[in-house]
């Protein structure tokens, strides 16, 4: 029995042709032919069982046979906002794993001590799509490009909001304990993760003034991408249906 082939098509229900990159993979790598079955995902929670109707040099046409809406396996919306790492492969690693675990938004912060002040999201988007297909998750996280810390915390966000930091002079609560106390309450969750040098103390205070709760991620001192993944996994575990 052939393994199911999955393709990302944002407007799968209304389109009739795979996007160019997906078509090239379907035709050149998987060598799909007319009447072959494939599965599409729209990034908004649905799979589609489809049949290839035309397999040309650069075009792969299809016909939808069945729409299969999926129920999200976690409550609320989970957003992890982090300062991108100096080496982009570490940020890409986090984006891949967070997508596999299941989050709703990945945002990137330009902070005072950020090691990377510029970042491109085209490659990151491709990594996210690949992780969606690999993990069979039909939800594509919103990818929010690099935003100044001030602008991000100044924007109203619903639900529970946290900022992770390492300052002894600012009291913090444990992220896992706090989220566990709110388990199964269908709360949106936003967690801010700083750069390797941490947020500045003024940034932490600014976030607190905007309603963010200062939190600890445990006793270990974690790298940025590890801290971000820890936050994503913790939010997933306590919000799991």
Model-derived features: where do they sit?
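N-terminal positively charged helical leader segments and presequences
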Residues: 1-70
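Mobile, glycine- and charge-enriched loop segments
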Residues: 38, 63, 71-84, 179, ...
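Structured adenosyl-cofactor binding patch, chiefly the S-adenosyl-L-methionine
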Residues: 201-241
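Glycine- and other small-residue-rich loops at beta-strand/loop junctions that grip anionic moieties
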Residues: 83, 117, 196, 220, ...
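RNA substrate-binding interface of SAM-dependent RNA methyltransferases
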Residues: 71-163
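Active-site/ligand-binding-proximal alpha/beta "capping" segment
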Residues: 163-206, 212-217
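Fold-independent oxyanion-binding glycine-rich loops
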Residues: 10-11, 20, 43, 83-84, ...
């Amino acid at each position: 029995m052939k393994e199911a082939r999955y393709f990302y098509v944002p407007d799968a229900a209304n389109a009739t042709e795979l996007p160019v990159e997906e078509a090239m993979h379907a035709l050149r790598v998987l060598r799909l032919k007319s009447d072959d079955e494939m599965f599409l995902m729209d990034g908004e929670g649905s799979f589609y069982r489809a049949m290839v109707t035309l397999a040309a040099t650069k075009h792969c046409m299809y016909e939808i046979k069945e729409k299969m809406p999926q129920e999200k396996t976690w409550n609320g919306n989970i957003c992890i906002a982090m300062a991108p790492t100096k080496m982009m492969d570490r940020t890409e690693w986090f984006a891949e794993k967070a997508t596999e675990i299941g989050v709703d938004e990945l945002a990137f912060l330009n902070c005072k001590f950020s090691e990377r002040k510029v970042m491109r999201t085209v490659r990151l988007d491709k990594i996210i799509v690949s992780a969606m297909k690999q993990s069979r998750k039909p939800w594509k996280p919103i990818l929010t490009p690099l935003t100044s810390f001030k602008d991000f915390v100044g924007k109203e966000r619903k639900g529970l909001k946290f900022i992770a930091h390492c300052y002894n002079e600012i009291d913090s609560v444990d992220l896992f304990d706090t989220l566990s106390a709110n388990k199964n309450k269908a709360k949106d969750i936003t967690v801010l993760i700083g750069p390797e040098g941490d947020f500045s103390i003024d940034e932490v205070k600014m976030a607190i003034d905007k309603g963010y709760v200062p939190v600890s991620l445990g006793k270990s001192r974690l790298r940025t991408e590890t801290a971000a993944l820890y936050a994503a996994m913790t939010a997933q575990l306590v919000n799991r249906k």
